[in-house]
Amino acid sequence: MRVGLDIGSTTIKCVVLNDAGQIVYSTYERHFSHILEKGRALLEKVAAEYLPDGRAYLAISGSAGMGLADSCRVPFVQEVFATRVAANRLTPGTDCIIELGGEDAKILFLTNGTEVRMNGSCAGGTGAFIDQMATLLKMGADEMDKAAQSATRTYTIASRCGVFAKSDIQPLINQGAQAGDIAASIYQAVVNQTIAGLAQGRPIKGNILYLGGPLTFSRTLRQSFDKTLGVTGTLPENSLLFVALGAAFYADEESDLREVAKRLDNYSAAATYVSLPPLFADQQEYEAFHARHMKATVPCLPFGADCGPVHIGIDSGSTTIKLVVIDNNANILFESYRPNLGNPIPLVKETLLKLYRDHPGLQIASVTTTGYGEELVKNAFHCDRGLVETVAHFTAAKHFLPDVDFIIDIGGQDMKCFKIEDGAISNIFLNEACSSGCGSFLQTFAQALGYDVKEFAALGLFADKPVDLGSRCTVFMNSSVKQAQKDGASIENISAGLSISVVKNALYKVIRASSPEELGRRIVVQGGTFYNEAVLRAFEKEMGVHVIRPDIAGLMGAYGAALYGKAKAGENARSTVLTEQELAQFSQKVNTVHCQGCGNHCQLTVNVFADGKRYISGNRCDKPVTGKANNEDLNLYAYKLKLLDGYRSTPAPAAPRARIGLPLCLNMYELLPFWHTLFTRLGFEVVVSPFSSRSLYQSGQATIPSDTACFPAKLSHGHIHWLCEQGVDAIFYPCMSYNLDEHLGDNHYNCPVVAYYPEVLEGNCPELNGTRFLYDYFNLERRKDFYKKFQQSLDKYFPGLDKKAVREAIDAAYDEYHRHMQQLRDKGSEIIAAARAEGRRIIVLAGRPYHVDPEVNHGIDQLIIRQGAAVVSEDSVSWHEQKFQTSVLNQWTYHSRLYAAAKYCTENPDMDLVQLVSFGCGLDAVTTDETREILQAGGKLYTQLKIDEITNLGAVNIRLRSLFAALEERREVQAPLALS
């Protein structure tokens, strides 16, 4: 008999084979991290029921199996090898295996030797991710699969991280999208993540095998893979057990299973892990801590007829709805905290009706809304005002600590931090790349270990040796936890370690503080996560100060909104909110349409209410609402696109020498005027790829070799694919280490991705095999060399070009480039002058030349225009500055412009900078800190927007509105500065 055990990140699988290789017993169950106990129970059961003498050939495999194999001295077989053994035996001729597990994803290429690709730093697109999404849709995994079968369309959803997929999905739920469409979109996101992130440019073809839980249980997921890959994959019998079967086939050592189980029973690891000091020295210290935090309270009074006028604050969050009623003395009369179940409107209606019915004659002086659903709730119920959530939280914090200088709010899946200087918000931090410092992080672990989250948190309070877990992705922290368990850590010490890691992640990953002291000394902590006393204590210990944790930590947004409404309402105010009679007649209808008003083609959600009032969301300009588009006269991004589009409509020569393609990506956004002019003058017909789109991105997705490349680089694969489909004679996309020197920095390099990505395209785009691809190295700064180098390069492909004609074409190209850049500078100056004449704020939307691509910036420029500001770019103002000293090596042209633009903003009171950062950009780890320092040294706010393929702009909108609210607040606090 043969026995194979596969212990994965979330499940344990076991197979028993008879001498003919047939399965006589198999099991597949979750282990909830109780690996030793489950393993022992399985071995005892198999020995008792299937092995009369207790002996069998035994091997163990799986991502969590090595520790168990070591503990009981049994052979361990690596899971990739076990999978290959099983595939060779059971499905010979397999070319490729796609396996999705609970927290890991793998692609095994078996043709021409074995090659394996596994997920590295992120567990998006795995079984755990699908489970999270099913929970969000209030479905089981089976129900989600069934719902997806009825889908009629798909939406763009990030599978990079469960939390950020939530930020894409939650608005769709709120906007009334069909559950089946969302479910199908989730499966498609998993497919995209697997192909782009794991295949890394290697084609997936031939006989394909699907393995692992998600692919076994979801027919829709298999169909999505089949459709995207253009093949029909096979789901083999016993697909869940392949690794266990491989281990059983591989086993070459006979073991006594009863003896092995006994070894596990006697196994007790010494506590050898790295530990941290306990949260509390003793019970007395805890009681003093508990008593101190019970003082930050808001009086809650009975809600009677004599309460007078009341003020209501409604915080419509991404997953919850909070409502607070206060009197004129800021006492709480009523509070409500409920999950919004995807649509806040019915819950708000229900709560308002309850207030009217329970309190006849109720006088409502003001209703103020805040949060993600602020505008929707405000418009639906005719509330008096909306308030951006950062200001709502700040207003509430000031009530508890008037001279507060730092606020941190940790919710279930988001984190907000504000620095306060001179009574106004001076800096805002949001988690943009990872959720491992949020409440859902602890909840995930509590559930995985079989505990309620409150019970789990309480376990850690008196842990004697908390595990040092560092701060990592939610999913990959699991491996740290398993290792700690193997090393003898108790559940109590793991709970305490996780609470400490939440705090460290918030401070050092999100805020990126170099030391706790720089954040502040008068701190208010908010959000539901701080009800967890272990997290609260860990935060105080890490910061070295006592903090204020209000007893309404989870209601601070709603409370702040109510306070703000009270302050603005004035004497004898009466709210415009719907009356009891109007609420009884209230109804809401939701439908989604694509706006055809401009090239953005925004997906609009139209809410129609019983009184005929409409609320439209999802629009990036005002055209769907007012019938008029945004005023593009004050938008330099729109002007840049218009100039670039002009080159596409240039007529081709009558008898072109050849058709040459230019991919409009990365540095081509800056150098298109140069190359287009050069080739046109030489008699070529120039074919320029279009501005990027979702479909163009997906057309090149299969050839992307690494998921770590920035989104603008990934887009270039689609541009190459498009040009090849046009049948051009050649594609020209040179490698360029250097830019033209603008004398703003110590050197004038391109970043490595921009400089050398043509090499990556040449090596990974099979369609280039049928098209000449010209990607020689050029340096435009060395003009004399360039004449010669360019002539030599072109002669290889198009011999016989006249030297004089080439020189004249090059001279014309330089002239056109300089003319184009001067046009941008002149237009920037014109916009700034016009904005000043109208008293508008001016935002320098700073990034790289390719951030003007609509698919990259997602219309963020339009959002800023909607706030009533003007938009210019970094290259339209950087020329005002001379080279200056920076604290980092200033050697990249695009970054030199960024630093110069930041400095220019500090010299102009009506200008502020918003930095666009592409997710995954390594150099921006440096530039963001330097830009922040330059701006803060000049008394300016720093705002960073991280962007990639995610198109939902809810968080971006909040960020921008927070900036404008903070600027307005500063203007009120300080006397206005005179313009220089």
Write out the residue ranges for each language-model feature.
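Glycine-rich phosphate-binding/hydrolytic loop that grips phosphoryl groups
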Residues: V85, G127-Q132, E237-A271, T395, ...
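Conserved phosphate-binding/catalytic loops in two-lobed NTP-binding clefts
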Residues: F76-V80, D226-L245, D384-V391, E540-Y559, ...
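Glycine-rich phosphate-binding loop plus the immediately following alpha-helix
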Residues: H34-I35, N112-R153, L240-V243, F249-E253, ...
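Short glycine-rich, Thr/Ser-proximal phosphate-binding strand/loop in the N-terminal lobe
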Residues: G4-K45, E115-V116, G120, I314-K354, ...
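Acidic, glycine/GT-rich loop-and beta-edge segments that sit at the periphery of enzyme/chaperone cores
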Residues: K106, E253-P309, K416, A567-E632
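Glycine-rich phosphate-binding loops at beta-strand->alpha-helix junctions
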Residues: A64-G65, L198-T228, S239-V243, T370-G373, ...
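Adenine-nucleotide phosphate-binding core of ATP-dependent small-molecule kinases
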Residues: A165-A196, S479-Y508
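An N-terminal assembly and electron-transfer interface module characteristic of large anaerobic redox
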Residues: N119, A123-I130, N329, C434-L442, ...
